UniProtKB/Swiss-Prot annotation:
It catalyses: L-asparagine + H2O = L-aspartate + NH4(+); Cleavage of a beta-linked Asp residue from the N-terminus of a polypeptide. Its EC number is 3.4.19.5, 3.5.1.1. This is Isoaspartyl peptidase/L-asparaginase. It is an enzyme of class 3 (hydrolase). Belongs to the Ntn-hydrolase family. Its main location: cytoplasm. GO terms for biological process: asparagine catabolic process via L-aspartate; proteolysis.
Amino acid sequence: MKPVIVVHGGAGKIVEELDATYRAGVKRAVLKGYDVLSQGGSALTAVEEAVIVLEDEQIFNAGHGSVLNEKGDIEMDAIIMDGKNLDSGAVSAIRNIANPIKLARLVMEKTDHMLLTCEGATLFAKAQGIPEVPNESLVTERSRKRWMKNLKENSNPVADQIGLGTVGAVAIDCEGNVACATSTGGLTNKMVGRVGDTACIGSGGYADNNVGAVSTTGHGESIMKVILARLILHHMEQGKSPEEAADAGLNYMKSRVGGIGGVIIVNSSGDWTAKFSTNQMSWAAVKDDQLHIGIYHGENNVTPLEKAL
């Protein structure tokens, strides 16, 4: 099996002046993940490493750069799933952690549970030697300005959420194992304690070697209502291609609950897609030594991998 990896930097509306920054970010992430796969590493490690890159990039709403809740603080969610045995680990409403996806994997591998939240997740992180960082160190000037703007009367936090999507990755390795990983800072100016789709298995992501892997982005409550990631895999189980399944899932979410978003998918044969119902979604993929990058509908810029390194 030839390895494949796809990453996304969130669905929404990307302003033109940040176009190149988003492209550079997803490119770095997908190349990091593919480097793991090309050396015989697992899909699980590949998606984790790719998402760590995205969490460290200030432009994305995950890790460093996460949006602020109504109190001006950061609370983050993340999930990772292994398609080989359906094991999954997730964390929600966590603070003071630079890379939530690392903690999510530890939940999967070091506990009998699948999701730890808030204080419990913090205690677990300490026990595992994950260093705490001041939440303020994760706050960017961009996030702070957006938070302050939405404190004003007649503000519209929902509209201001545009371009602040979740980040994620899906991959299949040389042994045919698939995995997904998703991480987010959530909704800007959200209520304290709000947890969205990302940390919820089947919504923020799902991976099953028998079918494939999905990572989602978009309006979290809408994604949760239709259990988007698992819904898409169900369509694939019924014989749809990744592209057909993505369209079916996104169209259903829009028609049924009025939600928009985006998905990245890889199936058990290594076929992949990146689809979205928002204006834009930054994404990148590597397959057959070809780097693919896009932001706009119908865009797929292809570069030989040797020229992209």
